[in-house]
UniProtKB/Swiss-Prot annotation:
This is Chorismate synthase. Homotetramer. It is an enzyme of class 4 (lyase). The keyword Flavoprotein applies. It comes from Acidovorax ebreus (strain TPSY). This reaction introduces a second double bond into the aromatic ring system.
């Protein structure tokens, strides 16, 4: 299986399966000399961890990260950093009834046809469990970018199923299980309680933002910053759409309003989402993700088995009724990995470029 590594200079290779003994990643290309400990990584893993509310999977994994290599006396050495997360709460017996059939909307069918076999336990390699190493690697990238450029990452949910979530303030996001930017989440609690009782699932929309991104990241024509962002975001489980800046809303805009006016005091707007011509402008990078409903649900559905015969599928086990609820820290990590890789590439090629005129300020829209 190929496709398990992302990045050019900051390379991350992800390994493991949902019900295997462990999952993890190897980071190659991290600059030496950065202070790094397990605690630096664990904070983000705890934000993504399962079993933290009644609205997510009740699989109880501590997701304790172990640094196996690449750090000596508390600092990165420049050699590959191996990160390991042990699986401790697998319940493989829950998947015996679907080992010979395919879940509608799941990767089961495609994996079986491509590889000739599949691991049905928790989805195997296609499980969202494999986003934990991504978050771990993203924490390393976040730390370096914060120390080098002051870059910060944050994400929130802007829609849960049919319910839009109005933006109030980023300060609310850490204080509710939905990563919602609102003070009152009772409507979303009630919605998820009813959804879970019905045996169904729902999708979500996620907004992710990077601030204080340096100007000049991105490599035209085919390694554009926004192209790479879209590429890795589509690699996140259940993502079916990616928008940069105004995204699909730009279809209904006129050129007089879509173009972000430049003034000596700064940009007037940020419809471009911080990227022009595939290169960062110094504005906030703004990305939105459309996440489909979870395919593993307890409601019976029509499918076929591995012999091509009709069957009814009921998925037991512990699943997220909305995978979007835990997607915010994962989206942050993926965005950080792309920006980290492009920052190192920019430094390698254009590190000596100096402009007489400083970049203009970014507009701050919340």
């Amino acid at each position: 299986m190929s496709g398990n590594t992302l990045g050019t200079l900051f390379c991350v290779t992800n390994f493991g399966e949902s019900h295997g003994p462990a999952i993890g990643c190897v980071i190659d290309g991290c600059p030496p000399g950065m202070e790094l400990s397990e605690a630096d990584i664990q904070a983000d893993l705890d934000r993504r961890r399962p079993g933290t509310s009644r609205h997510v999977t009740q699989r109880n994994e501590p997701d304790a990260v172990e640094i196996l290599s690449g750090v000596y006396e508390g600092k990165t050495t420049g050699t590959p950093i191996a990160l390991l997360i042990r699986n401790t709460d697998q319940r493989s017996k829950d998947y015996g009834n679907i080992a010979q059939s395919f879940r509608p909307g799941h990767a089961d069918y495609a994996y079986w046809h491509k590889y000739g076999l599949r691991d049905p336990r928790g989805g195997g390699r296609s499980s969202a469990r494999l986003t934990a190493p991504t978050v771990a690697a993203g924490a390393v990238a976040k730390k370096w970018l914060a120390e080098k450029y002051g870059t910060r990452f944050r994400a929130c949910m802007t829609q849960l199923g049919e319910l839009p979530i109005p933006f109030e303030n980023w300060e609310h996001v850490p204080h509710n299980p939905f990563f919602a930017p609102v003070a009152d989440v009772q409507a979303y609690e009630d919605y998820m309680d009813a959804l879970r009782k019905s045996g169904d699932s729902c999708g979500a929309r996620i907004r992710v933002q990077a601030t204080s991104v340096p100007v000049g990241l991105g490599e035209p024509l085919y390694d554009k910053l926004d192209a790479d962002i879209a590429h890795v975001m589509m690699g996140l489980n259940a993502v079916k759409g990616v928008e940069i800046g105004a995204g699909f809303a730009s279809v209904a805009q006129r050129g007089t309003t879509h173009g972000d006016s430049l003034t000596p005091t700064g940009f007037a707007s940020n419809n471009a989402g911080g990227v022009l011509g595939g290169i960062s402008t110094g504005q906030d990078i703004e990305v939105s993700l459309a996440i489909k409903p979870t395919s593993s649900i307890i409601s019976p559905r029509e499918s076929i088995d591995i012999h091509g015969q009709s069957t009814e599928v009921i998925t037991k086990g512990r699943h997220d009724p909305c995978v979007g609820i835990r997607a915010a820290p994962i989206a942050e990590a993926l965005l950080a990995l792309v920006i980290m890789d492009h920052a190192l590439r920019h430094r390698a090629q254009c590190g000596d470029v100096v402009q007489a005129v400083a970049p203009i300020p970014a507009v701050r829209l919340g």
